[in-house]
């Protein structure tokens, strides 16, 4: 998994409806991603870089707020995030993905400018970076791998647009373009790619549908 810095400045609190979420609680919610699987307190603590006591207290609070689910396996407490509650998306996945995007942009400003053009194309619905650039293992010879979903019968038009950006930016894109309704079929047709998208993909456009496909529909 790509390592990201999850700890940010102190003093942040947000109010969502009737719930008040502290900075630490928000950081813990995002720490469940990208796997969104069960974790121990120690595993969560390693990701958020706070003391055991503070993490434990925040987890108890999140459990009371019904955002996190606590259960016991043997002598160990295990925690998981409830993917159906809106905070899992807004404070969890969104926050995690924003951090991924920011770290990518810092390293690859020119590539990001080109990706923005794909985002702004009215025919594109999802724009997802995958492959070596999303994993941080790219070389000078690496193409930029993008999945772009679009309206049916617009695949060739979108593919040609993405490839045309090479002339403007000097970047070799390797786009995979298909209609938006075909995205969920990746899970069955190419489970290795599906897992790579979940673990390493950077979603620049369409993160709400990506979250639904990968996390809610994948349960």
Task: Annotate each language-model stretch with its function.
Residues 147-149:
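A contiguous pocket-lining binding segment that forms or flanks enzyme active sites
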